[in-house]
Structure formats: C-alpha cells, structure tokens
C-alpha cells in the first residue's frame, strides 16, 4: 500500500472511533505518516507533535504488529490533540484500546495481532488497565468487505496502460495499485494478464492495511561462498550496488534470509533500501 492509502485507512478507523458529530472541529486526522524502509533497534515508531508527523520503522516485523504500532502512534496524535500532551498513562491507553477495538471490528487487523505482539509493552499495559484482551467486547463493523486492491509488479513496460486505467504507483510496494469492487477485480486481472505474466498480479482485500516493502541484502568478503550466493538468488553488483552480492527481498523475509547466511563464516552483511 502507498503511504497515502495507509493514511486514508487510518482516517477511516478514526472516523469510526471518533465520529465528527461527537467530536466536532477535531484535528484527529490532521497528521502525516512516513513509512521508513529502515530497521531500528530501540523503537518501532515515533510521533512528533510539533510536526504532527508519524514515522514507522522495522518493516521486517509481522504485518499485524506494524499495524498495531501505527495505531499506537495515531493514539499519541489523538491524545495530544485532546490534552496538549501525550505519555503512556492510562488515558493514552484508553485511546489506543478504542482504536484497536475499532480496527479489529472493521477487519483492518485481528485480535491475534495484539496477542502475539511481544516486542513492546502495549499488551501488558493494556491488560493491566482493561483486563484480558481476549475478553474485550468487539463488534463487527461493515467496512470495504466487497472491495479489493489489484497490485501489478514488474510492470514498467506497461505502466502507461496501467496509468490510463487508473492505477497509482506505490513506491513502498514497488507496484502499480488500483482499488475496485470484488465483481470487477477478477475481470480486471484477466485484462492485465493479456499484457504481463499473471504471476505479477496480486489481488488483496481492501479492508485491511498491508505495510510491506523491499530490502536489498548486500554480502561482501564472501569469495569462498559466491557459488552458494548465486544459487540462492544473489547477483554480483546487483541493483546498482557495488562490490557486493545483492538479493532483493520482501521486508518481512529479512530475518529468515539473514538466518540462512549465518552458516557462511567471515562474511559481511549490510541491509540497504532504495
């Protein structure tokens, strides 16, 4: 998804959780989101109240955990709009709980995304304040169940055709993307498949957030292992990188790809993004 599509979906969650008629003249949707294709050690996201800006990192994590982090930062923005400050008090977690319950009800994420998220203190603090997450009262909400995204990858040669059909380029996905109804999606796929290999066409439900991108795994000091690297999809000086064997990988494959390299002694590994 593009940053703008992610932003619009977050705004839909806010509209459901904090309807304008109950919160007139609010500025809850007046923020910017920047998805950083970068791994950080000490935090997954951050909010700058003076700029109304949210940054999200660590795209190697499970998608549902990234969504939970994104809603955490949206919670800080709403908290700041209400109180002119934000912290990790019970007041903040009341806002976060409300956002999470709304997003789960809409199908944007699942309750398992919260239960399995063990790389932050949110789950512990939410249950301390509000009891077992599995016992929360969550109502299903009607949200885009009948809409899909079509994503077209490796499609530079047909980009003009895609633009003419209303597709927008997502630099995060590195794909051309269009939203449409379920009745249109399969027919559209057949049209695009006339121009490009069908394996480069993906259809995904539009009622969730999918935050994904690509990393470039760069391996150097590895002369003794070049045969192994070549067999496993690495290219010498690939993708414009210099003096390294390079493999383009989905961001959420980073940990598993790094694990495969552990058996190669003395190599140097760098993770790059474009």
Question: Predicted regions: what is each one?
Answer:
Residues 82-125:
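Post-HExxH zinc-binding segment in Zn-dependent metallohydrolases
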Residues 6, 67, 71, 88:
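Hydrophobic (often cysteine-bearing) scaffold residues that line and stabilize catalytic clefts
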Residues 110-274:
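Accessory DNA-engaging acidic/polar modules
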Residues 68-80:
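Active-site recognition of the HExxH zinc-binding catalytic motif
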Residues 1-55, 99-102:
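Auxiliary, metal-adjacent structural segments of Zn-dependent hydrolase domains
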Residues 51-70, 84:
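Short pre-active-site segment immediately N-terminal to the catalytic Zn-binding motif
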């Amino acid at each position: 998804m593009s940053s703008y599509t992610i932003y619009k979906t977050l705004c839909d969650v806010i509209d459901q959780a904090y309807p304008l008629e109950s919160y007139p003249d609010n500025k809850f949707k007046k923020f910017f989101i920047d998805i950083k294709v970068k791994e950080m050690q000490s935090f997954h996201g951050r909010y700058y109240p003076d700029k109304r800006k949210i940054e999200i990192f660590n795209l190697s994590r499970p998608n549902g955990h990234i969504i939970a982090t994104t809603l955490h930062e949206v919670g800080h923005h709403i908290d700041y709009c209400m109180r002119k400050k934000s912290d990790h008090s019970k007041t903040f977690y009341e806002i976060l709980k409300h956002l999470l319950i709304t997003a789960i009800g809409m199908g944007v994420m699942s309750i398992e995304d919260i239960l399995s998220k063990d790389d932050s203190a949110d789950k512990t603090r939410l249950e301390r304040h509000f009891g077992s997450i599995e016992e929360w009262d969550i109502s299903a909400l009607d949200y885009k169940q009948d809409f899909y995204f079509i994503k077209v990858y490796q499609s530079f040669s047909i980009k003009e055709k895609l633009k003419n059909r209303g597709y927008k380029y997502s630099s995060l996905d590195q794909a051309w993307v269009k939203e449409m109804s379920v009745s249109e999606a399969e027919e559209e796929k057949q049209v695009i498949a006339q121009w490009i290999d069908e394996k480069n066409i993906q259809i995904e439900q539009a009622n969730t957030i999918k935050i994904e991108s690509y990393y470039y795994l760069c391996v150097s000091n590895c002369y003794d292992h070049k045969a192994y690297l070549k067999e496993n999809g690495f290219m010498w000086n690939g993708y414009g990188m210099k003096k390294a064997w390079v493999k383009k990988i989905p961001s959420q494959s980073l940990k598993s790809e790094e694990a495969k390299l552990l058996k190669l002694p003395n190599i140097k590994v760098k993770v790059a993004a474009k």
